[in-house]
Amino acid sequence: MSMVYFNILMAFSVSFVGLLMYRSHLMSSLLCLEGMMLSLFVMMSMTVLNNHFTLASMAPIILLVFAACEAALGLSLLVMVSNTYGTDHVQNLNLLQC
């Protein structure tokens, strides 16, 4: 495994560990998810370019579109929760508290 792939895999791992550790606030969870999606995008783009997969050349763009949709939905959820409850704690998203 080359050093570039190792660094991208480490970025994904650090983002995943951050998602597991800092899950009390919604904003930190969204940032970790964005880091994971960015590292997946870079890894997929490099794989497509290095192996000359012509049929899979649209896959990184599709992943980037899904990442943008995820970011938009996450930020709208963050605004809704912060306006409703006054905080961005993930504990407020539990629907069983009603």
Curated annotation (Swiss-Prot):
Single GO MF annotation: NADH dehydrogenase (ubiquinone) activity
Provenance organism: Neophoca cinerea
Protein's recorded name: NADH-ubiquinone oxidoreductase chain 4L
Record's bilayer topology term: Multi-pass membrane protein
Family under the similarity heading: Belongs to the complex I subunit 4L family.
Subcellular location as annotated: Mitochondrion inner membrane
Gene Ontology biological process terms, A to Z: ATP synthesis coupled electron transport
One GO location term (cellular component): respiratory chain complex I
Coiled-coil residue spans: none
Keyword Electron transport: yes
Record's catalysed reaction(s): a ubiquinone + NADH + 5 H(+)(in) = a ubiquinol + NAD(+) + 4 H(+)(out)
Disulphide bridges, residue numbers: none
